[in-house]
């Protein structure tokens, strides 16, 4: 889907790929990554985030969860990796890459839970109280404390097929009450996906109803007497499109 943009902006990479494939240097179905350009784009994004008080995480599922690039990004000052599925999280753990957020699209399976929690992710997304209880039990056994981010749902939210799940706004209060009673975990934020999508007609990235759901949930939690006084609430407003106009 990005081939046209690559051909327009990075012709040397395209020419090199053709040359290497035709000369037998690489096989078909080989991924070529322009390391220098990736890092240049990453610096631009981080500078924009820093200037606006936004913590920067990175996601590498689109480029094969590459640990070499992940290490360069953490050295650059990125907080850690966003691992939307457990295989990506395990790859990062095995390469000593800090974990930012885990479980956003695919919940962490029980069999991988302890290994991932030992890596001390900044925050773990949960869709259900059952998963929160599993994390609580594992953290209690391991002697860890984990922040949880609740995926929230509102009426009219845009959801992709196969990605349903989360806490409806009307049950958020009771869910927070239940989680705050669990040992070794706490509510640390709310999220949804996608909160922004590219609109072909408008030729721009526009907010989805999910964004208002996240804002409402955050307001509810901040106003709730159930939330711990030390809670520094994090809202993740996930986009499904590129949002930094200055990248190459």
Regions found by a protein language model. Give the residues of each.
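Active-site-proximal loop/turn and secondary-structure-junction residues that shape catalytic pockets
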Residues: 62-64, 85-88, 106-108, 128-131, ...
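A charged N-terminal "starter" segment
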Residues: 1-114
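A generic, well-ordered mixed alpha/beta core segment in the N-terminal half of proteins
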Residues: 101-102, 108-154
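A general structural detector for well-ordered alpha-helical segments in enzyme core domains, enriched
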Residues: 41, 45, 69, 88, ...
């Amino acid at each position: 889907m990005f081939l046209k943009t690559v051909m327009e902006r990075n012709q040397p990479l395209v020419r090199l790929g053709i040359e290497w494939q035709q000369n037998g240097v690489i096989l078909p179905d080989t991924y070529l990554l322009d390391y220098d350009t990736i890092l240049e784009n990453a610096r631009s994004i981080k500078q924009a985030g820093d200037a606006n008080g936004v913590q920067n995480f990175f996601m590498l599922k689109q480029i094969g969860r590459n640990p070499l690039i992940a290490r360069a990004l953490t050295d650059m000052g990125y907080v850690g990796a966003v691992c939307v599925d457990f295989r990506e999280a395990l790859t990062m753990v095995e390469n000593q890459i800090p974990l930012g957020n885990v479980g956003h699209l695919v919940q962490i399976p029980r069999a991988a839970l302890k290994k991932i929690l030992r890596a001390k992710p900044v925050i773990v997304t949960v869709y259900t109280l059952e998963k929160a209880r599993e994390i609580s039990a594992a953290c209690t056994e391991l002697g860890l404390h984990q922040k949880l981010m609740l995926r929230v749902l509102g009426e009219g939210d845009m959801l992709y097929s196969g990605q349903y799940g989360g806490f409806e706004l009307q049950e958020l209060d009771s869910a927070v009450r239940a989680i705050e009673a669990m040992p070794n975990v706490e509510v640390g934020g709310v999220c949804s996906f996608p909160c922004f999508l590219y609109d072909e007609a408008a030729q721009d990235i526009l907010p989805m109803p999910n964004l208002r759901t996240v804002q409402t949930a955050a307001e509810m939690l901040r106003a709730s007497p159930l939330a711990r006084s030390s809670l520094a609430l994090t809202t993740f407003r996930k986009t499904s499109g590129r949002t930094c106009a200055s990248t190459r």
